[in-house]
Amino acid sequence: MILQSWHESAFFDTSVSPLAGPPVAAYFLNLRVNQMSSRLDETAVIAALKTLQGWQLARDDEQRPAIEKDYSFTSFNAAFAFMGRVALTAERANHHPELLNRYRRVLVRWTSHSEGGVTALDLELAATCDKLAIDSGLKAQDSSK
């Protein structure tokens, strides 16, 4: 099947990326795939967020601590490409964010359900999202919260 062939090549051949920009695998150099860490306390999360521009402490739908950022792109296609690249990254890390698309805007929210809050992996994936956003057509003036 075409879909199966694409799926296999996208996840096992790290030189293949179905979306524009560098291969998604380029963002895994420092990512500890499948290594969930312990939940961080709120003070540690707030301190770590100072190194991530535009990310904020939030709550998910079940009121667990989370981190989120609202990105603004140059077009709907750029926003959707970003979401695709985040999805590939999340699948590879076996850790999935909440994504909400509103035309040229994408809200990304990370939390670790199994740990009941934010972990170091969430923070690392947030930093990866920032890199993916730049490569996907992020507006010069990011409309972060």
Regions found by a protein language model. Give the residues of each.
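N-terminal leader/targeting segments
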Residues: 3, 26, 35-38
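Leucine-biased recognition of intrinsically disordered, low-complexity hydrophobic segments
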Residues: 3, 19, 29-31
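Low-complexity, intrinsically disordered tandem-repeat tracts enriched in small/polar residues
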Residues: 9, 19-22
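Aromatic (phenylalanine/tyrosine) cluster motif
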Residues: 11-12, 27-28
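Glyoxalase I/VOC metalloenzyme domain signal
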Residues: 23-25, 128
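Charge-rich, low-complexity N-terminal segments
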Residues: 31-52, 57, 63-71, 76-107, ...
